Curated annotation (Swiss-Prot):
CDD domains: MnmA_TRMU-like. The gene is mnmA. Coiled coil: none annotated. GO terms for molecular function: ATP binding; tRNA binding; tRNA-uridine 2-sulfurtransferase activity. Interacts with TusE. This is tRNA-specific 2-thiouridylase MnmA.
Length: 373
């Protein structure tokens, strides 16, 4: 066993089970371990869904149980400037951003990494992400987590090999039930705590109410792809491609009782376009263009290559061909049509277990013949 006793690791303690068990595993590996709780959002309303106080108490209880110090830091200003404002801009433009990816890039593996190294003297940071790191020829690669159901590499594709080299992911080698089992054996307060969902650091508040505070909603018509007016939407920003719930429209004589899905957003005219059936041709894409590219462990690609892509989290791998258009953009052609490819979301590329990198979906290629010009 390598001597880790001189190495200091700061674990990002979220108040959840994954970071709790990560801290314990690192202690078992002989590291000097301390925790850091990041406050990244200033609550302004004191409502019960702001769970930061509960999360901090849980993180403190875990650190007390493990005999670890817990530091706290406030990154709310960095979060607002580098994550939240961009998030709002994307919604204003009719796109659907992924704030968790931006938060990992700007906060967890930038602000936190710098603070841990410079202020706390850390050799490494650690998080409870379900990913693995592999060092090859002096560069760190990002690998999928061992638990295919929980793999979170999709959210970490913006990391550089330099950032990865300073990061540890202890639970990436485990499956989730094993993580919970360890927490239960240790009698950690987080053992049965449910996994967090919702916007990174904003928690599980009602998304529509939350967004409406910062962006004025503009109600408008819901139209079918055939030009029928079937309802009203409360704001395009509340809807995303492929969405089924919350449309408030029933079946039609022509389409029967098949559920309605959002197939497009006409931002210029404030129209929400819908069609019936989850495989409606208007919902399908044969490819996409991705921009703001990031390759984890290498320079920009210069030649076409084969790989698989995910256009959203927990999606099945999609075989595709990636062709560079320039250093900042690639064209992706799927082997088979894919539903609900959404501009603003990320396309993330893999070869086997290795996450190569990804980019933001700029535009999608509709199924030929599905859109009337």
């Amino acid at each position: 066993m390598s001597d880790n006793s001189q190495k200091k690791v700061i674990v990002g303690m979220s108040g959840g089970v994954d970071s709790s068990v990560s801290a314990y595993l690192l202690q078992q590996q002989g590291y000097q371990v301390a925790g850091l709780f990041m406050k990244n959002w200033e609550e302004d309303d004191g409502e019960e869904y702001c769970s930061a106080a509960t999360d901090l108490a849980d993180a403190q209880a875990v650190c007390d149980k493990l005999g670890m110090e817990l530091h706290t830091v406030n990154f709310a200003a960095e979060y607002w400037d580098n994550v939240f404002e961009l998030f709002l801009e994307e919604y204003k433009a009719g796109r659907t951003p992924n704030p968790d990816i931006l938060c990992n890039k700007e906060i967890k593996f930038k602000a936190f990494l710098e603070f841990a190294a410079e202020d706390l003297g850390a050799d490494y940071i650690a998080t409870g992400h379900y990913v693995r790191r592999q060092d090859v020829n002096g560069k760190s690669r990002l690998l999928r987590g061992l638990d295919g159901n929980k793999d979170q590499s999709y959210f970490l594709y913006t990391l550089s090999h330099e950032q990865l080299a300073q990061s540890l992911f202890p639970v990436g080698e485990l499956e989730k039930p094993e993580v919970r089992r360890i927490a239960e054996q240790l009698e950690l307060v987080t053992a049965k705590k449910k996994d967090s969902t919702g916007i990174c650091f904003i928690g599980e508040r009602k998304f529509r109410d939350f967004l409406g505070r910062y962006l004025p909603a503009q109600p408008g018509p819901i139209m079918t792809v055939d030009g029928q007016h079937v309802g009203e939407h409360q704001g395009l920003m509340y809807h995303t491609l492929g969405q089924r719930k919350g449309l408030g429209i029933g079946g039609t004589k022509e389409g029967g009782d098949d559920p309605w899905y959002v197939v497009d957003k006409d931002v210029a005219n404030n129209i929400l376009l819908v069609a019936q059936g989850h495989e409606h041709p208007r919902l399908m894409s044969v490819g996409l263009i991705a921009q703001q590219l990031h390759w984890v462990d290498r320079e920009p690609v210069t030649a076409a290559f084969r790989c698989v892509v995910k256009t959203r989290y927990r999606q099945q791998d999609i075989p595709c061909t990636v062709t560079p258009l320039d250093d900042e953009r690639v064209e992706v052609r799927f082997d088979d049509p894919v539903a609900a490819v959404t501009p603003g979301q990320s396309a993330v590329f893999y070869q086997g277990e290795v996450c190569l990198g990804g980019g933001i979906i700029e535009e999608r290629y509709p199924l030929p013949g599905s859109v009337a010009n």
